[in-house]
From Swiss-Prot:
GO cellular component: cytoplasm
Annotated source species: Sphingopyxis alaskensis (strain DSM 13593 / LMG 18877 / RB2256) (Sphingomonas alaskensis)
Site (Transition state stabilizer): residue numbering on this chain: 38, 260
E.C. number(s) listed in UniProt: 2.7.2.8
Protein name: Acetylglutamate kinase
Pathway membership: Amino-acid biosynthesis; L-arginine biosynthesis; N(2)-acetyl-L-ornithine from L-glutamate: step 2/4
Compartments, as annotated in UniProt: Cytoplasm
Length: 302
C-alpha cells in the first residue's frame, strides 16, 4: 500500500531535493578527484562535530571523491603532558619538544587520535586506514630551524625546538594506493628524518605538503574561525596571491592566520587547484563549500 507524504512536510522535502539537484554539477566535476582535509581545532573535542566530520568524509568517498585526512592534536598532547607532569614550553607557537615530549606526542597523535578518527569513519561504514608520515616513507622531515632576537641585545640567536620538524619530501605512493583501493587514509603528523629521529610536524604544514604532492583538487584547512576576515570582521570569500600580499601588508591578515594562509598559498603553488580555510565547528561546512553555490569559507587560488 502506497503511503502519501504529509503535505505539511512537502516544502522541506522539496528543499532537500533542490539541494541535491544543486549539487549535481559539483558531483560531476569532482568525481575521481582527491581532496586533502586538515582536521583540527576545537571541533575535534566535540562529539557532535566529530560525527559531522566523519559523515562528511564518508559521503565524499561514497560519491566518488577521494578524501585524505591529516589531523592535528595539540590540545590533546598538552593534556597528556600535563597528566604526566611534563611541562610544555612554546616558541613562536611551536612546542619545544624534547625526547620525552616527542614520545608522548607520537603516542597521542598516532596511537590515540588517529585510531579514534578511523573508528568514527568505520562506524559510518567507511573504510579508513590510519597511518603516520613514517609509514612507507610518506614524509621525510628535517629539524625546524628557528631564531629569535635577544631581548637585551637585539641579536638574533638560534632556538633549539628539539624534535620539531618540517616536511622536506613527500612520497604519496601509499596514499594513492589506499585511495585507489577504496580506503580513506587518515594521517598523523609525525615523520622520520634522515637522521632516523622522529619529528613532530605542524599538522597544517604537513597537510599542505601532502596536498601539493598529490596534486589535490582541493585542500581544506579546518580551523576555529570562519576563514580570512577583513578589518570589519566580514568573511573574505575569494583571494589570490596578490590580494593576500596586500592584506598582509596592511595588517588585515595577522597572527596565527598568517601561517595558515601561507600554507594554503604553498599548496596552490605546488599544484593544488585551490585551498579553502573554513570553520570546522559549523556542521557539514565542507559539504556547503563543495556542493553549493554559497560556499562556507575563504577560497585561495592562483
Amino acid at each position: 500500500m502506497m503511503t502519501m507524504a504529509d503535505p505539511s512536510k512537502m516544502p522541506d522535502l522539496l528543499a532537500k531535493a533542490e539541494t541535491l539537484v544543486e549539487a549535481l554539477p559539483y558531483l560531476q566535476r569532482y568525481a575521481g578527484q582527491t581532496f586533502v582535509i586538515k582536521y583540527g581545532g576545537h571541533a575535534m573535542g566535540d562529539p557532535e562535530a566529530q560525527r559531522d566530520f566523519a559523515e562528511d568524509v564518508v559521503l565524499l568517498k561514497a560519491v566518488g571523491i577521494n578524501p585524505v585526512v591529516v589531523h592535528g592534536g595539540g590540545p590533546q598532547i598538552g593534556a597528556m603532558l600535563k597528566q604526566l607532569g611534563i611541562e610544555s614550553t612554546f616558541v613562536g607557537g611551536l612546542r619545544v619538544t624534547d625526547a620525552a615530549t616527542a614520545e608522548v606526542a607520537e603516542m597521542v597523535l598516532a596511537g590515540k587520535i588517529n585510531k579514534e578518527i578511523v573508528g568514527w569513519i568505520a562506524g559510518l561504514g567507511g573504510r579508513a586506514v590510519g597511518i603516520s608520515g613514517k609509514d612507507a616513507n610518506l614524509v621525510l622531515a628535517e629539524k625546524v630551524k628557528r631564531s629569535e632576537a635577544d631581548p637585551s641585545s637585539g641579536i638574533e640567536r638560534h632556538v633549539d625546538l628539539g624534535f620539531v620538524g618540517e616536511p622536506v619530501a613527500v612520497d604519496p605512493t601509499i596514499l594513492a594506493n589506499l585511495t585507489n583501493d577504496n580506503f580513506i587514509p587518515v594521517v598523523a603528523p609525525v615523520a622520520l628524518g634522515a637522521d632516523g629521529a622522529t619529528y613532530n610536524i605542524n599538522a597544517d604544514t604537513m597537510a599542505g605538503a601532502i596536498a601539493g604532492a598529490l596534486g589535490a583538487k582541493r585542500f581544506f584547512l579546518l580551523t576555529d574561525v570562519a576563514g580570512v576576515l577583513d578589518k570589519s570582521g566580514a568573511l573574505l570569500t575569494d583571494l589570490d596571491r596578490a590580494a593576500i600580499d596586500a592584506l598582509k601588508a596592511d595588517d588585515t591578515i595577522t597572527g596565527g592566520m598568517i601561517p595558515k594562509v601561507e600554507t594554503c598559498v604553498a599548496a596552490v603553488d605546488a599544484g593544488v587547484e585551490a585551498a579553502v580555510i573554513l570553520d570546522g565547528r559549523i556542521p557539514h561546512a565542507m559539504l556547503l563549500e563543495i556542493f553549493t553555490t554559497r560556499g562556507a569559507g575563504t577560497l585561495i587560488h592562483r
